[in-house]
Amino acid sequence: MHILKMKKHSIFGSALLSTALLLGACGDNEEVTATVDSSQVQNEFGFQAFELDIDTADQNDAIEASFDIDVSETEAEYVNKLESKDLTGNEAYTELEPIFKDLALTKDMSKEDVIEKVSKAFGAEDYTEFELEVEFSDGDNQEFSDTK
C-alpha cells in the first residue's frame, strides 16, 4: 500500500512539474498581438521571414533579429546588446518595422549590397561575423554570410 501511495505522489509531482515547465515556456512569447496585415507587410518589406545574427569584436551575438509572418500569426524578436535592447512581440515589431521598411531588400540584390545595407541599418558595420537568412515574399529563401 505504501508503494502505491509513493507512486501516486511521484506521478502527480511529475505532472505538476511538467505543467510548470510548459507554462514557463509560454512566458517567452515572440508573437505580435497587434493587427498586422501580412500582404501589406510583405509588399512593404519584400520578405516574410528574416533571421539575423551579427557578432562584433567586442560582443558575440551583438545583434539578433528575427521576424516571421504567416497567415495565422506574426512573430518578432530583437536583441541589440550594443544598445541594451531585448525585445519580443509587439515591442520588437515596433522597433524593427521602420528598419525593415528602409532596407527595401529584393532577391535580386547582390550579397555585398544586402550585407552592407543590413549591417548599416542595424549599426554594426564593424561586424566580425554576419549571418542573415531571408524568405522573400515569393517564398525564395536566401542566405547571406560574411566573416571579417
Per-region residue spans from a language model:
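Hydrophobic helical h-region of N-terminal Sec-dependent signal peptides
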Residues: 16-18
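Bacterial signal peptide processing site
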Residues: 27-30
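Extracytoplasmic
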Residues: 47-49, 60-62, 127-129
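Short, exposed beta-strand-loop hairpins at the edges of beta-sheets
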Residues: 120-144
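Bacterial N-terminal signal peptides that target proteins for export
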Residues: 3-13
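C-terminal motif of bacterial Sec signal peptides marking the signal peptidase cleavage site
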Residues: 22-25
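Post-signal peptide N-terminal segment of mature Sec-exported envelope proteins
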Residues: 35-56
